[in-house]
Amino acid sequence: SKTLPFLISEKGMTAGVELAGPGAVAEDLRLQYRYLDLRRPSMQDHFIKRHRIVKRVRDFLDERGFLEIETPVLTKSTPEGARDYLVPSRVHPGHFYALPQSPQLFKQLLMISGFERYFQIVRCFRDEDLRPNRQPEFTQIDLEASFIDEEFIYELMEELTVRMFAVGGIELPRPFPRMTYREAMDTAGSDRPDLRFGLRFVEATDIFRNTNYAIFQKIIQAGGCVKGINVKGQSDVLSKNVLQNEYAKQIVPSLGGKGM
């Protein structure tokens, strides 16, 4: 074997030792030297855990009688919630394939064909603007089953989620809390409330029914309601001045709120 044209000091041998966390290096630089970035133990651990989670998903759904069936990637455009990514066809000039936003139609075909339980670890593509909960391509656990009720889905997804988190050494408390859509909207104003946030909306319409405050009057007369958040023991922090200036003019608009 040939010798290296330079000497490697023992001090430079850092196998298995992470010299700096991801925050210590600019993301652009990490991506430029991705092959070095992926040598870090923490990065490799992400890939290893993902592999084990996906394997756990496959094993669990196989135990429950689900078949993993791949669906086409180059397909016809179908109505979905975003724009399609289009791929020009070489064989048919002027025509395009569409990358799937989801395998919705294909899995419905499988159901009516007699495959009663299907799943797929599938790549999806959506041409939409980047947001915290949106990206152009993503992988999802896609499944479908025939002749079941909602209780079947509740129990299936709870058990699957518990097993997935267990791969990372996280034990989730059971049973999972359940909340109706109406309860979520009434108490949190969202159909996906963050349960870590303990403050819930409190109905205050009756308190303000005879108020002279024009905005509240207009809302109540139109059949709307007035709700608030009861923040106890924070009067010295959330003063009227802070609420009217810092929160109403800066924080609320930055989060998409119209006013406060």
Predicted regions and their residues:
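Class II aminoacyl-tRNA synthetase catalytic cores and aaRS-like
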Residues: S1-M260
